[in-house]
Amino acid sequence: MKRFIYVCAFFLCLCSCSESKYIAEELERTQEIINDYPDSALHSLQAIVPGSIRKKSTKAHYGLLYSLALDKTGQTIDTDSMLRPAVNYFMRKGTNRQKFLSWYCLGRMEYSTNNYQKATESYLKALEYRDIIDDPYLIGVCNFVLGELNLKQNKLSKGFVLLSRSLRKLSGCK
């Protein structure tokens, strides 16, 4: 009986490791297509059961990609239940691009829930990485939304400065 339990435990560990590897590989494939095929990326992410993800790094990667896919398909990010852990994880162990994107997505979510002050803070935290990530499009979009947020909060001069900064960044994009 003891041997049977050990064998079952071994196979359970083996299966969970392979599932983890499969999910990580699927997330890598999804990351490669998310900009060109956001609908397909979202569909791929929806096929993954978030509760089956065990590793913190994989959960963070999934939460960020899922939020990006929702944003890129024009859907609202209405909760930070997957995004907040991603922000926390990437602030400790992520690349500068992951840090930028996680703050950016959090800002999108806060903006969509009309929490303009929090959204402004998140976008400003994202822009702390602007010189490091060197992505004029993302930086331009971030400045554009910040400009819009300032206009909504009646900070007109700051809003126009950010909007003009956004236009300069976006004019260099293809």
Regions found by a protein language model. Name each.
Residues K2, Y6-C8, C17-K174:
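A "functional boundary" signal
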